[in-house]
């Protein structure tokens, strides 16, 4: 009987740990462009890692509007769009003041509308196959199932670090 209680206690603790892990809120996102990987963190602890597709010109930081590059630097999630043409999207606060200055020095605009998003309805069937190539205009793309999970885990105000 005592052994059974201990076993039940261990199962209960494990279940509570799983529930806590799935309800933790992300406080930082790290995107490693070279690895095509996005990691959600909470208090320095990895919550989840996703494979991603990037801008169609993935090497180097975004410099000007229309260059199809994914930015590099430190940003925040400053808005969520539940009516996105890409299922759901989280807006990244690009361009920063530094990004604006760099583009201005080239006589150009820095661009904007950089998001973490899912797949447009006509392409949702592709699921993880969409990652076979970098195809966005500079955004970070995941599957629709993944963006639904990310949507729940990432609040507005979350820090985003995009590394080469």
Per-segment meaning from a language model:
Residues 1-9:
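Bacterial N-terminal signal peptides that target proteins for export
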Residues 28, 49-51, 74, 113, ...:
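Well-ordered beta-strand positions in beta-sheet-rich domains
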Residues 45-57:
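Short Gly/aromatic-enriched secondary-structure transition segments
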Residues 79-164:
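Exported/periplasmic cell-wall-interacting domains
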